[in-house]
């Protein structure tokens, strides 16, 4: 009796999801509607709804460089969330190498670079027509705080196999993400503050994607693990996540912690472009 019932239940579930597949997934976030796509994984009747390139903050351009991330601008149209956002500005060869070396996806992602990078991707196996609340896992990519991107890591298999909502996030890298004058004019750690902004967005919006904002795990590898460690220690991250997995890398990794006066080095760089450095404020503004 059990086997026929199980077969019928499986067929019913497949038929229900087949109906959902006739139209792409549409979710209303606090900033506006996003349109994703269903992707099926071999061996699973239930597809995964995938949303790519959702903005969680304003583009950090112009006067927003070297400042706190600002909330994303709302939109009054349906935003297409079916293509990957650009990687943050970085060395193209190194970025391509890291992308190809560490990716878990089969297809190649065209290399696009931009300072406009504060986007996240969501992979959810939840039935968005119901009030499902699945655990959430937020992935922070590695790359030495210099290279890398969310698009390198495909959350499809993890979402389908473990029945969790997977979020992969991006943040500012290199000098744009970690430049500091060592004082209040430009305290630095902009990249880590971007990660906090993404976690705030998750708290505010992930329930609409079938995720449980009260069960968020952050995890990352290499310098992504360092970022996890930083967030665990930061009082600014209180109540934004509930579990943490640091896959190598910690907050006090020696190569990532530098002390000293940044002004002499900055003066050398600015002389190359014939700019005068008078104050930390002018340094931040002209960088």
Swiss-Prot record:
It is found in: Secreted. One of its GO terms (molecular function) is carboxylic ester hydrolase activity. GO terms for biological process: anatomical structure morphogenesis; lipid catabolic process. It holds the Pfam family COesterase. It comes from the Eukaryota. Glycans are attached at residue 80. Residues 1-18 form the signal peptide. InterPro entries: AB_hydrolase_fold (IPR029058), CarbesteraseB (IPR002018), Carboxylesterase_B_CS (IPR019819), Type-B_Carboxylest/Lipase (IPR050309). Disulfide bonds: none annotated. Keywords: Glycoprotein, Secreted, Signal. Gene3D superfamilies: alpha/beta hydrolase (3.40.50.1820). PROSITE patterns: CARBOXYLESTERASE_B_2 (PS00941). Expressed in placenta. GO terms for cellular component: endoplasmic reticulum; extracellular region; lipid droplet. Has no esterase activity. Belongs to the type-B carboxylesterase/lipase family. This is Putative inactive carboxylesterase 4.
